[in-house]
Structures are given as C-alpha cells and as structure tokens.
Regions:
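Residue-level signal for pocket-adjacent positions within structured domains
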Residues: 1, 35, 40-43, 83, ...
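Arg/Lys-rich, positively charged N-terminal/basic patches that mediate binding to nucleic acids
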Residues: 1-31
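Residue-level signal for beta-strand positions within conserved beta-sheet cores that form or flank
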Residues: 2-4, 41, 55, 75-78
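Amphipathic, hydrophobic secondary-structure cores in small proteins
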Residues: 14, 46-47, 62-64
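A short, surface-exposed loop/turn module that caps and links secondary-structure elements
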Residues: 32-58
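Enriched for short, Lys/Arg-rich terminal
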Residues: 61-64, 69-99
Length: 99
C-alpha cells in the first residue's frame, strides 16, 4: 500500500495553529485520507467539477471547509486552505483564476 504525503499551504498551517480544536480534526482527517483513499467515504468530501482542475476536493467539518488537491502520480495531498464556508469559496475563485 502506498501512503500519500500531505503538504499544507502556509494559509492552511496558519489556520490549524490558530484554531486548535477544529484544526486537529482536519489534521486527523487528512492523515486518514493519506493512509488510505478509501477513507474518503467516511468524511463529507465532494469533488469540484472544473474543466481546469479535475482533482480538487473540499472536506467539510462543521462550518469549515478545506480545499485540497489529490495528485495521484506524486502520491500527494495538497491542502490549499481551511476557512469558514463563506470565505473558502471566495478564496477558491481567486486560486483557480490566478493560475
């Protein structure tokens, strides 16, 4: 079994440090996803349907969302950011259209 590596953006790391309780829950969720992608079914994860990016997902825990990308050929989960529901989608538009 191949384990995925997890890489957090600076914004995601900052969120986890600043919001310990919910940050730990996201951290544990990503650890479980990295161990086995089949664990994705135990979480509220949905895929974004974008022509530009086919491998971007969101993970919901409570009122917060994490936007992440699974890069299978590198065995990498890249977490863009974690924020409240309203803020994360505004940020997502900026990321997708800047690149």
């Amino acid at each position: 079994m191949n384990f995925y590596k997890i890489k957090y953006s600076k914004a995601a790391e900052k969120f986890i440090k600043k919001n310990k309780a919910i940050g730990i829950r996201f951290f544990k969720a990503f650890e479980e996803l990295a161990e086995d992608r089949e664990n994705i079914k135990f979480y509220d994860v949905k895929k974004f349907y974008s022509k530009t990016y086919e491998d971007i997902f969101r993970l919901r825990i409570g009122d917060y969302r994490a936007v992440f990308r699974i890069i299978d050929n590198e065995l990498l989960i890249y977490v863009f950011d974690i924020a409240s529901r309203g803020d994360i989608y505004k940020k997502l538009n900026v990321w997708l259209f800047e690149k």
